[in-house]
């Protein structure tokens, strides 16, 4: 060891942890499942039962027992009443009143004239009853008598009648107008193909002969008063522009 030469400050020492390059097997790279607890327990090992403590369940009422609010009678057993006779004391009923026979003063024979003797009818106006609005008595308009006109009479002879219904648009001429052929629908064959054909004539447009189509001037196109070449005319003078004194004259022939 004393003769070894080391470069730098590095010296051989014990590693602090396992080095994967020193093992041919997976080694500590894979962790085995534990044998404690309930989650991720080793399936090849025996596991004891695990228990958990849940929350207290909700109660609808604070007191579930009947308590002293219920007074159970002494004659009530587990199967119901014991069947002993029970008696109660009621009040005294009222005495039945005796029948009172009416005397002579209880009758009014003077009021029996209309019922015992013949009398003229009398009428009175009473007030409207409360059930008048709910009266369901049918009136004359509630009845419908059978008609004596028409074919629906059983005991009457009626002439035949007819009715006109509307035309349906499905499968009718309203749906397809081609189903109603008009005069233009048929193709009429020319009668000249199977009969003697008379001579036929046609009218063409008028033919115009070729000629000079230039516009010829009329009498109004000329101005004879402006012609001065065929008559003597006095001399005419006009005013020209003033030339500048500083303009050089035009010299055409230059002397050598």
Swiss-Prot record:
User: Where would I find the STPGR repeats?
Assistant: 66-92, 181-206, 217-242
Where does the UniProt annotation locate this protein? Cytoplasm; Cytoplasm, Cytoskeleton, Flagellum axoneme
Q: Where is the signal peptide?
A: none
InterPro entries per UniProt? CIMAP (IPR051291), SHIPPO-rpt (IPR010736)
Q: Which keywords has UniProt assigned to this entry?
A: Cell projection, Cilium, Cytoplasm, Cytoskeleton, Flagellum, Repeat
Coarse class of the protein's main subcellular location:
cytoplasm
**Pfam families attached here?**
SHIPPO-rpt (PF07004)
The record's Gene Ontology cellular component field reads: cytoplasm; cytoskeleton; motile cilium
User: Could you tell me what this protein does?
Assistant: Outer dense fibers are filamentous structures located on the outside of the axoneme in the midpiece and principal piece of the mammalian sperm tail. May help to maintain the passive elastic structures and elastic recoil of the sperm tail.
State the PANTHER family in the record: BOREALIN N-TERMINAL DOMAIN-CONTAINING PROTEIN-RELATED, SHIPPO-1-RELATED
Per the record, the similarity remark reads: Belongs to the CIMAP family.
What else does UniProt say about it? 'Shippo' is a Japanese word for tail.
User: Mind telling me what this protein is named?
Assistant: Ciliary microtubule associated protein 1A
Q: Which gene encodes it?
A: cimap1a
């Amino acid at each position: 060891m004393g003769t070894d030469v080391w470069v730098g400050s590095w010296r051989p020492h014990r590693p602090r942890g396992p080095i994967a390059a020193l093992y041919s097997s997976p080694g500590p790279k894979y962790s085995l499942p534990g044998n404690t607890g309930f989650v991720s327990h080793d399936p090849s090992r025996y596991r004891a039962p695990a228990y958990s403590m849940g929350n207290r369940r909700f109660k609808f009422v604070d007191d579930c027992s009947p308590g002293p609010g219920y007074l159970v009678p002494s004659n009530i057993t587990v199967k119901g009443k014991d069947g002993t006779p029970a008696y109660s004391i009621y009040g005294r009923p009222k005495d039945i009143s005796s029948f009172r026979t009416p005397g002579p003063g209880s009758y009014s024979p003077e009021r029996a004239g209309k019922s015992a003797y013949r009398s003229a009818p009398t009428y009175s106006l009473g007030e409207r009853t409360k059930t008048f609005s709910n009266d369901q008595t049918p009136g004359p308009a509630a009845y419908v008598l059978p008609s004596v006109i028409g074919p629906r009479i059983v005991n009457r002879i009626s002439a035949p009648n007819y009715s006109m219904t509307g035309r349906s648009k499905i499968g009718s001429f309203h749906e397809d107008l081609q189903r109603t052929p008009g005069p233009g629908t048929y193709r009429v064959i020319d009668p000249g193909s199977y009969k003697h054909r008379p001579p036929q004539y046609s009218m063409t447009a008028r033919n115009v002969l070729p000629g000079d189509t230039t516009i010829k001037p009329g009498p109004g196109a000329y101005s004879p008063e402006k012609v001065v070449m065929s008559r003597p005319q006095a001399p005419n003078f006009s005013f020209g522009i003033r030339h500048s004194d500083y303009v050089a004259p035009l010299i055409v022939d230059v002397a050598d």
